[in-house]
Amino acid sequence: SLENEGYDGEVHYYDFEGAPMALSVFPGSLIVPWPYGGFGIEVMDANGGWVATATDLLRFVTALDSGKLIKADTLTTMVSHPMAPLWQGSSYYYGMGWLVRPNGNSANWWHTGSLPGTYSIVVRTFNGFAWAALFNTRPEDVDAFSKELDNALWDAYNGVTSWPTNDLFK
C-alpha cells in the first residue's frame, strides 16, 4: 500500500479532491493520502490486492466461463443462490464472489471493487458478453458513480447492433 512499493508500470492512485488525509497504518509515516498507507492491503483477506488491466479481468471471466479454469459445476456453485434466509425477496443475490441477477435459465453476474484510490467493475451477461472498467481513483460519492457507470455500460452494450466475430484478445 505504500507508494514506493508499487509494481513496475502500476498506475498512481488518486483520492477524490478534498479527501481527508489518513493516519498511516505503517511505521515511519504519520499522515498520508488514503491510497498510500491509510489501509494495509497486504493484511486484507479476500478483498483487494489484484493488479490487473481490464483485458486481464476479461480473460479471467472468459476462462471461468469456458471451463478451462474451473469445472462447470464449480462455476454453477459460485453463482448459485445462497441458502435461505439470505437475499430472500431480492431481484439479485451474492453467490460466491459474484453478485448474480437471474435472467431466464441463465444470469448476469458481476463484481465491483473499491478502496480509496480505486474502483473496478467486471460484468458477464446472461448470454456470454463481458466487460470491465478500472479506475485509479474513487469518487467521493462512489455509490452514485457506480450506478451511473453501470447504466452507461449497459446502454453502450444495448446500443451495439453488430458484434465482431473475431477473437478480440488477439
Regions found by a protein language model. Give the residues of each.
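Short conserved micro-motifs at the rims of enzyme active sites and ligand-binding pockets
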Residues: 110, 121, 134-135, 143-146
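Short, well-ordered beta-strand elements
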Residues: 119-125, 129-138
